[in-house]
């Protein structure tokens, strides 16, 4: 099993993702979660941090393209796991419409893997790319993930994401383990508005205003 773990670690490191980490998991019999992310940037003309004007289509299409690219990049990992007979499952994107919760929290797994922290925008914030990342989670029946490693939130007194939300859905509370989501964000109001705005364009509005305002996102990232 140790040889398999080493092969998995080597493969994860070779995929070309912006960042990745392992953390123990306890979900549907899986014991380990590999959390990976790709960082992205927008064209200057549609990037608020570069003086541009937010464009929904550009933001949405960027997310789709980066997600599709990331899923393709995971193929070598699947091959290694399949060859070793290790059961695995890639957590799909999306949430339960009634609870607005995912079947497995990619954000929490990423935080436990030491990749970032949950910011005042209720999204994962990474030290180098802020919240401008697309997350991927592969759950595996693999032992030896190691103890969780968490980062202290580094948002400090920054309120950029809060100020960027035109509806005031962010409260300004700093996320901490065990806090009720409603104390940080009115998730249902936010989701309802994104659905309303999305009707004319045929998909739920992606609305990246809060995450694109994070000053950490100004660091250079390469779209894959």
Predicted region positions:
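Non-catalytic, usually N-terminal nucleic-acid engagement modules in DNA/RNA processing proteins
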Residues: 1-68
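Catalytic cores of enzyme domains
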Residues: 59, 65-224
